Amino acid sequence: MPEQVQHGEDEVETFAFQAEIAQLMSLIINTFYSNKEIFLRELISNASDALDKIRYESLTDPSKLDTGKDLKIDIVPNPRDPTLTLLDTGIGMTKADLVNNLGTIAKSGTKAFMEALQAGADISMIGQFGVGFYSAYLVAEKVVVITKHNDDEQYAWESSAGGSFTVRTDHGEPIGRGTKVILYLKEDQTEYLEERRVKEVVKKHSQFIGYPITLYVEKEREKEVSDDEAEEEKVEKEEEESKDEEKPKIEDVGSDEEEEEGEKSKKKKTKKIKEKYIDQEELNKTKPIWTRNPDDITQEEYGEFYKSLTNDWEDHLAVKHFSVEGQLEFRALLFIPRRAPFDLFENKKKKNNIKLYVRRVFIMDSCDELIPEYLNFIRGVVDSEDLPLNISREMLQQSKILKVIRKNIVKKCLELFTELAEDKENYKKFYEAFSKNLKLGIHEDSTNRKRLSELLRYHTSQSGDEMTSLSEYVSRMKESQKSIYYITGESKEQVANSAFVERVRKRGFEVVYMTEPIDEYCVQQLKEFDGKTLVSVTKEGLELPEDEEEKKNMEESKAKFETLCKLMKEILDKKVEKVTISNRLVSSPCCIVTSTYGWTANMERIMKAQALRDNSTMGYMMAKKHLEINPDHPIVETLRQKADANKNDKAVKDLVVLLFETALLSSGFSLEDPQTHSNRIYRMIKLGLGIDEDEVIAEESSIAPPDEIPPLEGDEDTSRMEEVD
């Protein structure tokens, strides 16, 4: 043996690392790997790659496995040295492989890596160990690699990262085939010798590697032995001598009567000695569920996997398990939770929704590029065969492969939603939790807008307590109806009682009630559905199908009320853009509508509530208001008569302002000066109750009001005011 060692030393060759090593080490520590534990992930994934290669070669030449049929990875911590050893039965490396892959940095440097990637190279072949191998130096001060390839002798590579490495023929214990990586740990990194820590890291990063990962731990146990066995143990181990003194006690017990022989033999075996043994435990017994055939997986298995993945205490609502093959290969397992998390739209919170694996190796658990924001509630796993293992976030953003994966995931999510929609009960639960996400998708995702719009559900004027889809709405449309009518507001009750829907409902047309703030953003992008335009009943230009008689009546009303419309515009001045005759009112005297492209009253309310709103936008988006009056309403008709009799009548002016302000409120707008409006109403109440205004003024004359209350113009003519009422 000494000769062999001497012979081995004669064979030692020293090589210099290329200059890039310092830069690469810095790159690994600062860019790719902020946490040291991933060194284990990298070494395990390298071992897995080596096993993949020998398995692939054995498909065409089974004799390749003659040097070892078991394809496995072993982890052996040794606290005495202290070393952590990883052993695989993979393809191994020749001497040339060792020198090239673990010394010629350029091959696995980032620059060469990315250039080769862009040139279409096979990712798994870029460097036998690639960048990840050097992450071993995060925890080790020295690394020894012993390797045996079927086509070469057994070699040992060694380096303390001091600018050089050595390669020699290894005459130590033969490993058959494969690679053994021995890490001589730094003093402050001995935590990786602990059974608990190794298990934790393997479970986190390499739980779904396709080969068994076995942890070998030396443990002590108490063994019960008979007297004779104890003697043998004593001879074998000198440290057992101290226990000889206990033997007479056992023999004394043995001097009992014959009927107690059974007990005697039991007590003989109560002698306990400590023995050391190697405990083996497979750490990745849970095979990747997503790599299995979906037909072979039960709902219970999906449920267990979902809970282990998400820590959710409830079962998932729906699952989609699929694989994509062809130019690009990946598998995915996607889950819809039963309920939305309370912080679903909290942008600054790091989301751990979809875990990204590359060839069963965990890469990251918060990959924003993998799924659009509106699908941020989807949980699951994506396992790619094509992405490089050491991919950084910067590279992910540029990756064309990831863009294709993302497109497929979105497509499959929409398929899952459509399938779920067939089960009304479950879809109702889904919609209650995630309707905002679908509407956000309509706002953001123009490509899938049509498919998303088919998933929307709303209450309508004809749906009662149930919600209905836009497809069902279209199927119920009248022959003469060309548009889908909708109204936005705060609640179902508010919009159902709105003045805007009066005429539309009376004519038998269905109105969609949109009561979530995000609906306003949604309909800005959703201009049509199934060839039918979406028309807001609160905006100008509402056209309802009319027959000839209705058109004639409308023209007559316009001519009849033209003078009143002009007068009201003069009185209200810049408060409104125009005053017109309405075709949408039945029982209300008037309403305020907005221009086609401006904000609705509901949108204006939402924007005013934004703490960080842009006031410059508010100026032009708070659309010009149009006052529409109902020619069939007695208030409007009486007002027209008064205006025709005397257009300078102060009571007319005051009533016009009061009507306008009341219409603002009923149409969903807020008043700029609610106090003035309130004072007008109080005065009307006093007039209705017959309270003399002069008496009230006399009583209150001693108290100086903070502001002068605008007088109710023409209030001296009480009888005329009452007549209008």
UniProtKB/Swiss-Prot annotation:
PTM-bearing positions, type Phosphoserine: S226, S255
Classification via SUPFAM superfamilies: ATPase domain of HSP90 chaperone/DNA topoisomerase II/histidine kinase (SSF55874), HSP90 C-terminal domain (SSF110942), Ribosomal protein S5 domain 2-like (SSF54211)
GO biological process: cellular response to heat; negative regulation of proteasomal ubiquitin-dependent protein catabolic process; positive regulation of transforming growth factor beta receptor signaling pathway; protein folding; protein stabilization; regulation of cell cycle
Keyword list, A-Z: ATP-binding, Chaperone, Cytoplasm, Nucleotide-binding, Phosphoprotein, Stress response
Regulation: In the resting state, through the dimerization of its C-terminal domain, HSP90 forms a homodimer which is defined as the open conformation. Upon ATP-binding, the N-terminal domain undergoes significant conformational changes and comes in contact to form an active closed conformation. After HSP90 finishes its chaperoning tasks of assisting the proper folding, stabilization and activation of client proteins under the active state, ATP molecule is hydrolyzed to ADP which then dissociates from HSP90 and directs the protein back to the resting state.
Gene3D superfamilies, alphabetized: 3.30.230.80, 3.40.50.11260, Heat shock protein 90, C-terminal domain, Histidine kinase-like ATPase, C-terminal domain
Biased composition (Acidic residues): 225-243, 253-262
GO cellular component, one term: melanosome
CDD domains: HATPase_Hsp90-like
PROSITE patterns per UniProt: HSP90 (PS00298)
Pfam family, one: HATPase_c_3
InterPro entries listed in its UniProt record: HATPase_C_sf (IPR036890), Heat_shock_protein_90_CS (IPR019805), HSP90_C (IPR037196), Hsp90_fam (IPR001404), Hsp90_N (IPR020575), Ribosomal_Su5_D2-typ_SF (IPR020568)
Region Disordered, residue ranges: 220-271, 697-725
Binding site for ATP: N46, D88, K107, F133, R393
GO MF annotations in UniProt: ATP binding; ATP hydrolysis activity; ATP-dependent protein folding chaperone; protein dimerization activity; receptor ligand inhibitor activity; unfolded protein binding
Subcellular location, record wording: Cytoplasm; Melanosome; Dynein axonemal particle
Motif stretch (TPR repeat-binding): 721-725
Family named by the database record: Belongs to the heat shock protein 90 family.
Subunit structure, interactors included: Monomer. Homodimer.
NCBIfam families tied to this protein: PRK05218.1 (NF003555)
HAMAP family the UniProt entry points to: HSP90 (MF_00505)
Further information: In contrast to other HSP90 heat shock proteins, this one is not induced by heat shock or mitogenic stimuli but is strictly constitutive.
Domain remarks in the Swiss-Prot or TrEMBL record: The TPR repeat-binding motif mediates interaction with TPR repeat-containing proteins.
Primary role: Molecular chaperone that promotes the maturation, structural maintenance and proper regulation of specific target proteins involved for instance in cell cycle control and signal transduction. Undergoes a functional cycle linked to its ATPase activity. This cycle probably induces conformational changes in the client proteins, thereby causing their activation. Interacts dynamically with various co-chaperones that modulate its substrate recognition, ATPase cycle and chaperone function.
Protein name per the record: Heat shock cognate protein HSP 90-beta
Species this protein is from: Gallus gallus (Chicken)
